[in-house]
Design a protein with these regions (language model features):
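Activity-critical C-terminal alpha-helical subdomain
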Residues: 179, 428-472
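N-terminal flexible segment immediately upstream of the FAD-binding catalytic core
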Residues: 1-62, 79-109, 138, 261-270, ...
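C-terminal substrate-recognition/cap domain of FAD-linked oxidoreductases
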Residues: 25-28, 32-34, 215-219, 225-402, ...
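Short beta-alpha connecting loops at secondary-structure transitions
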Residues: 106-109, 391, 425-432
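FAD-binding subdomain of flavoenzyme oxidoreductases
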Residues: 100-104, 110-255, 456, 472
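Short acidic/histidine-rich active-site segments
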Residues: 376, 416-423, 458-461
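N-terminal accessory segments
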Residues: 1-36, 67-69, 302-320, 412-417, ...
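Conserved, mostly hydrophobic/aromatic
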Residues: 64, 205, 384, 451
Length: 472
């Protein structure tokens, strides 16, 4: 069917049978909320199916591929790159009702879940057995495991514990061709065949729809220490990050904020910050009781570089909350200042962090666009926020030019365009600047193998010329 074409009554009748009673919506008012995500992009879906199990997903995919109808999987819509926006209309398949914890095996250190379960529900279930699942995006209370897997979204703990790719043992999925697929193992070792688990994680719903995941659990550390270090400028903070990451003790969080972020927090919150703060690091370490203070001392020593203004160590949970309040105040402040901001999540080698942030400051001045930078410094993963009024066409054009140069700077520093937000719609036209033609051709071939009719999340991930036809 052509993009925007109304779904035929016969198709909708069959779709209703496959979905089951109460699981299909076609009224435009009901479908409207399922046409957007946190990127603020919106394209209306023509139908929304609320899947309640793997069999329904299989039936919906087979029906859509038989009729050439675009199909976009969706969790809770917390993504920031338009990845769950149904660009070509068709059907949105919501997995939010597939939220069961199917199995927990402490001895095997694994948990099997449906992918509509929220990250927080997984953490709560694991905690009852003394474990956790390391990925911890800031939207953990709302985002789903399926979304975490689709974009390989991690969070602060990734610096020590890794991303979903390192913390997922296996998957159950349905390919775009309507074939059922199980990948991976239930063991800590396994090398039979190609690693399709890691291929599907981060594929943004373009190859298959993941219905179940076998998650690798990690024991919860009994103790944690939190430090906040404040520096005169970004260069000093970057030197501290390099110093911290070059010594043996690995922090479980190493978060960065630049002077623009600090100034914003100072205006919009009651956080206690020195007047001349030019950059800030939040440093956290976890471990056993007989190790934790030694580890915190080692990180504090590494953080003491020229340009350090002050370093504080929390002595109890109240002080921990007070130190983290600085970081948590940033997102509300950004929403107050620039509700139309562009939010990117670039990554550079840790050793190039100062060059990145100084380069961003230069681009901000050149284009007259405010830029606020913060993020996961231990990975070199910085959230670059371009502040603009979307109603001002001159600001929009300036921001577009600035963003183009931001991506150029990142690639010149040996970085990548996205660490955890994904490509989706927002970065698809830049992908060919990072990936070479051979890689793109192989990816297109893989897409055709998994999704020969091109129905799954069409128009995403890479420029249109690299997308196979179909899903219209």
């Amino acid at each position: 069917m052509a993009a925007g074409e109304v779904l035929r009554p016969a198709f909708l009748e069959t779709l209703s049978l496959v979905a089951g009673d109460g699981n299909l919506r076609t009224d435009p008012a009901d479908c409207w909320p399922y046409g957007y995500d946190n990127s603020r992009r919106h394209v209306p879906a023509q139908a929304v199916v609320f899947a309640t199990g793997h069999a329904q997903v299989l039936g919906v995919v087979r029906l859509c591929t038989r009729h050439g109808v675009a199909l976009t999987a969706r969790g809770r819509g917390t993504g920031t790159c338009g990845g769950s926006v149904p660009l070509r209309g068709g059907v949105v398949l919501s997995l939010e009702r597939m939220d069961r914890i199917l199995e927990i095996q402490p001895a095997d250190r694994l948990m099997v879940v449906e992918t509509g379960a929220t990250n927080q529900a997984v953490q709560d279930a694991a905690a009852r057995h003394g474990f956790f699942w390391p990925p911890d995006p800031s939207s953990a209370a709302y985002c789903t495991v399926g979304g975490n897997l689709a974009f390989n979204s991690a969070g602060p703990r990734a610096v020590k514990y890794g991303t979903p790719r390192e913390n997922t043992l296996g998957l159950r999925a349905v390919t775009g061709a309507g074939e059922e697929l199980r990948t991976g193992v239930r063991t800590s070792k396994g090398v039979v065949g190609l690693d399709l688990t890691r291929l599907l994680i981060g594929s943004e719903g373009m190859l298959a729809i993941i219905t179940e995941a076998t998650l690798k659990l990690t024991p919860r550390a009994p103790c944690k220490r939190t430090l906040r270090a404040i520096y005169a400028d970004v260069d000093a903070a970057a030197r501290a990050v390099i110093s911290i990451m070059a010594q043996p003790v690995i922090p479980c969080a190493l978060e960065f904020m630049d002077d623009a972020a600090i100034d914003m927090i100072r205006v919009y919150s009651q956080a206690d910050l020195p007047e001349h703060a030019g950059a800030l690091l939040m440093i956290e370490v976890d471990g056993d009781d007989d190790y934790i203070d030694h580890a915190a001392d080692a990180l504090a020593r590494a953080a003491k570089v020229d340009g350090l203004i002050a370093i504080e160590r929390a002595r109890d949970e109240t002080q921990v909350a007070a130190l983290w309040a600085t970081r948590k105040a940033l997102s509300p402040a950004l929403r107050n200042v620039a509700p139309g901001k562009i939010n990117e999540d670039v990554v550079v080698p840790v050793s190039r962090l100062a060059e990145l942030v100084n380069g961003l400051r230069s681009l901000s001045s050149t284009h007259g666009i405010g830029i606020v930078n913060f993020g996961h410094a231990g990975n070199g993963n910085i959230h670059v926020n371009l502040l603009l009024d979307p109603r001002d066409s001159s600001q929009v054009r300036a921001a577009e030019r600035c963003l183009d140069e931001v991506f150029g700077l990142v690639l010149a520093l040996g970085g990548t365009l996205s660490g955890e937000h994904g490509v989706g719609l927002s970065k698809r036209d830049f992908v060919a600047r990072e990936l070479d033609p051979v890689a793109l051709r192989l990816m297109r071939d893989i897409k055709r193998t998994f999704d020969p009719n091109g129905i799954l999340n069409p128009g995403k991930g890479w420029p249109d010329e690299f997308n196979p036809p179909g899903g219209n």
